[in-house]
Protein backbone atom coordinates (compact mmCIF):
# COMPACT_ATOMS: atom_id res chain seq x y z
CA UNK A 1 0.00 0.00 0.00
CA UNK A 2 1.32 3.46 -0.94
CA UNK A 3 0.81 6.12 1.72
CA UNK A 4 1.74 9.78 1.59
CA UNK A 5 2.47 11.62 4.84
CA UNK A 6 2.62 15.38 4.71
CA UNK A 7 4.01 17.25 7.69
CA UNK A 8 2.98 20.86 7.30
CA UNK A 9 3.91 24.08 9.03
CA UNK A 10 1.87 23.73 12.14
CA UNK A 11 3.17 23.47 15.65
CA UNK A 12 3.67 19.95 17.04
CA UNK A 13 5.75 18.56 14.19
CA UNK A 14 6.79 15.87 16.70
CA UNK A 15 3.34 14.31 16.20
CA UNK A 16 4.13 13.91 12.51
CA UNK A 17 7.45 12.28 13.37
CA UNK A 18 5.72 9.85 15.75
CA UNK A 19 3.35 8.92 12.93
CA UNK A 20 6.25 8.59 10.48
CA UNK A 21 8.09 6.26 12.86
CA UNK A 22 5.06 3.98 13.11
CA UNK A 23 4.24 4.04 9.40
CA UNK A 24 7.69 3.47 7.95
CA UNK A 25 7.74 -0.33 8.08
CA UNK A 26 4.01 -0.79 7.49
CA UNK A 27 3.68 0.52 3.91
CA UNK A 28 5.45 2.07 0.95
CA UNK A 29 5.83 5.51 2.50
CA UNK A 30 6.33 8.88 0.87
CA UNK A 31 6.83 11.97 3.01
CA UNK A 32 6.74 15.68 2.27
CA UNK A 33 8.10 18.14 4.83
CA UNK A 34 6.91 21.69 4.19
CA UNK A 35 9.12 24.71 4.72
CA UNK A 36 6.86 25.75 7.59
CA UNK A 37 7.30 22.35 9.26
CA UNK A 38 11.07 22.68 9.04
CA UNK A 39 11.00 26.18 10.54
CA UNK A 40 8.60 25.25 13.35
CA UNK A 41 10.59 22.13 14.21
CA UNK A 42 13.79 24.16 14.47
CA UNK A 43 12.04 26.68 16.76
CA UNK A 44 10.42 24.03 18.98
CA UNK A 45 13.31 21.55 19.12
CA UNK A 46 16.49 23.48 18.21
CA UNK A 47 17.22 20.80 15.61
CA UNK A 48 17.17 20.32 11.84
CA UNK A 49 14.12 18.30 10.75
CA UNK A 50 15.60 17.16 7.44
CA UNK A 51 18.76 15.87 9.13
CA UNK A 52 16.76 13.98 11.75
CA UNK A 53 14.58 12.40 9.07
CA UNK A 54 17.53 11.40 6.87
CA UNK A 55 19.35 9.85 9.85
CA UNK A 56 16.39 7.96 11.32
CA UNK A 57 14.08 6.98 8.47
CA UNK A 58 15.92 4.92 5.87
CA UNK A 59 12.90 3.33 4.17
CA UNK A 60 10.85 6.47 3.58
CA UNK A 61 10.92 8.36 0.29
CA UNK A 62 11.34 12.04 1.22
CA UNK A 63 10.08 14.37 -1.50
CA UNK A 64 10.83 18.03 -2.25
CA UNK A 65 7.71 20.12 -1.66
CA UNK A 66 8.84 22.58 -4.33
CA UNK A 67 9.03 19.95 -7.10
CA UNK A 68 5.56 19.55 -8.59
CA UNK A 69 6.84 17.15 -11.27
CA UNK A 70 7.37 14.23 -8.85
CA UNK A 71 5.26 11.06 -9.14
CA UNK A 72 2.88 11.79 -6.24
CA UNK A 73 1.58 14.78 -8.23
CA UNK A 74 -0.20 12.32 -10.54
CA UNK A 75 -3.21 10.16 -9.81
CA UNK A 76 -1.71 7.42 -11.96
CA UNK A 77 1.07 6.92 -9.39
CA UNK A 78 -1.43 5.23 -7.11
CA UNK A 79 -1.12 6.78 -3.66
CA UNK A 80 -3.93 5.03 -1.76
CA UNK A 81 -4.04 7.11 1.42
CA UNK A 82 -2.82 10.60 2.21
CA UNK A 83 -2.52 12.09 5.66
CA UNK A 84 -1.33 15.57 6.52
CA UNK A 85 -0.42 15.59 10.20
CA UNK A 86 -0.04 18.04 11.63
CA UNK A 87 -1.99 20.08 9.11
CA UNK A 88 -1.64 23.84 9.30
CA UNK A 89 -4.61 26.16 8.85
CA UNK A 90 -2.90 27.51 5.73
CA UNK A 91 -2.77 23.99 4.26
CA UNK A 92 -6.41 23.41 5.20
CA UNK A 93 -7.48 26.60 3.42
CA UNK A 94 -5.41 25.83 0.32
CA UNK A 95 -6.82 22.30 0.06
CA UNK A 96 -10.36 23.63 0.38
CA UNK A 97 -9.68 26.27 -2.29
CA UNK A 98 -7.96 23.78 -4.62
CA UNK A 99 -4.79 25.88 -4.54
CA UNK A 100 -2.08 23.39 -5.54
CA UNK A 101 1.05 25.56 -5.43
CA UNK A 102 3.31 22.96 -3.77
CA UNK A 103 3.78 19.21 -4.11
CA UNK A 104 1.88 18.53 -0.89
CA UNK A 105 -1.07 20.69 -1.96
CA UNK A 106 -1.06 19.01 -5.40
CA UNK A 107 -0.99 15.56 -3.75
CA UNK A 108 -3.99 16.54 -1.60
CA UNK A 109 -5.80 17.77 -4.72
CA UNK A 110 -5.05 14.43 -6.39
CA UNK A 111 -6.45 12.54 -3.38
CA UNK A 112 -9.64 14.59 -3.64
CA UNK A 113 -10.10 14.16 -7.38
CA UNK A 114 -9.30 10.44 -7.25
CA UNK A 115 -11.65 9.96 -4.25
CA UNK A 116 -8.82 8.47 -2.18
CA UNK A 117 -8.65 8.62 1.59
CA UNK A 118 -7.45 12.03 2.75
CA UNK A 119 -6.96 12.70 6.47
CA UNK A 120 -6.17 16.13 7.89
CA UNK A 121 -4.78 16.38 11.42
CA UNK A 122 -5.68 20.06 11.71
CA UNK A 123 -3.62 21.66 14.47
CA UNK A 124 -5.06 24.95 15.68
CA UNK A 125 -6.85 26.25 18.76
CA UNK A 126 -9.36 27.80 18.79
CA UNK A 127 -10.87 27.31 15.33
CA UNK A 128 -12.30 30.39 13.65
CA UNK A 129 -15.65 30.26 11.88
CA UNK A 130 -13.77 30.28 8.57
CA UNK A 131 -11.60 27.32 9.69
CA UNK A 132 -14.74 25.40 10.64
CA UNK A 133 -16.37 26.20 7.29
CA UNK A 134 -13.30 24.86 5.46
CA UNK A 135 -13.42 21.68 7.55
CA UNK A 136 -17.16 21.27 6.98
CA UNK A 137 -16.86 21.62 3.20
CA UNK A 138 -13.91 19.23 3.05
CA UNK A 139 -15.71 16.73 5.28
CA UNK A 140 -18.68 16.88 2.93
CA UNK A 141 -16.24 15.96 0.13
CA UNK A 142 -15.14 12.86 2.06
CA UNK A 143 -12.05 14.24 3.79
CA UNK A 144 -11.54 12.98 7.34
CA UNK A 145 -10.87 15.84 9.74
CA UNK A 146 -8.89 14.41 12.67
CA UNK A 147 -7.44 17.08 14.97
CA UNK A 148 -4.86 15.92 17.51
CA UNK A 149 -7.09 15.58 20.58
CA UNK A 150 -6.47 13.23 23.48
CA UNK A 151 -9.18 11.30 25.31
CA UNK A 152 -9.42 10.71 29.04
CA UNK A 153 -9.72 6.95 28.53
CA UNK A 154 -6.22 6.95 27.03
CA UNK A 155 -4.88 7.38 30.59
CA UNK A 156 -1.98 9.42 29.23
CA UNK A 157 0.29 10.57 32.04
CA UNK A 158 2.95 12.35 30.03
CA UNK A 159 3.59 14.00 26.66
CA UNK A 160 4.90 10.83 25.03
CA UNK A 161 1.75 8.89 25.96
CA UNK A 162 -0.41 11.74 24.63
CA UNK A 163 1.54 11.73 21.36
CA UNK A 164 1.21 7.93 21.17
CA UNK A 165 -2.57 8.21 21.55
CA UNK A 166 -2.89 10.83 18.82
CA UNK A 167 -0.57 9.00 16.40
CA UNK A 168 -2.44 5.79 17.18
CA UNK A 169 -5.79 7.37 16.32
CA UNK A 170 -4.36 8.53 12.99
CA UNK A 171 -2.99 5.02 12.35
CA UNK A 172 -6.47 3.64 13.10
CA UNK A 173 -7.88 5.90 10.38
CA UNK A 174 -5.21 4.63 7.99
CA UNK A 175 -6.15 1.05 8.96
CA UNK A 176 -2.63 0.32 10.21
CA UNK A 177 -2.26 -1.96 13.23
CA UNK A 178 -0.36 -0.65 16.23
CA UNK A 179 0.01 -0.87 20.01
CA UNK A 180 0.44 2.82 20.76
CA UNK A 181 -2.48 3.11 23.15
CA UNK A 182 -4.94 0.91 24.99
CA UNK A 183 -8.23 0.65 23.12
CA UNK A 184 -11.48 1.61 24.82
CA UNK A 185 -13.07 -1.15 26.84
CA UNK A 186 -16.42 -1.00 28.55
CA UNK A 187 -15.35 -1.35 32.17
Curated annotation (Swiss-Prot):
EC number in record: 2.5.1.129
InterPro entries listed in its UniProt record: Flavin_trans-like, Flavoprotein, UbiX-like
Annotated positions binding dimethylallyl phosphate: 153, 169
One term of GO molecular function: flavin prenyltransferase activity
SUPFAM superfamilies per record: Homo-oligomeric flavin-containing Cys decarboxylases, HFCD
NCBIfam families the record matches: PRK06029.1, ubiX_pad
Role: Flavin prenyltransferase that catalyzes the synthesis of the prenylated FMN cofactor (prenyl-FMN) for 4-hydroxy-3-polyprenylbenzoic acid decarboxylase UbiD. The prenyltransferase is metal-independent and links a dimethylallyl moiety from dimethylallyl monophosphate (DMAP) to the flavin N5 and C6 atoms of FMN.
Descriptive protein name: Flavin prenyltransferase UbiX
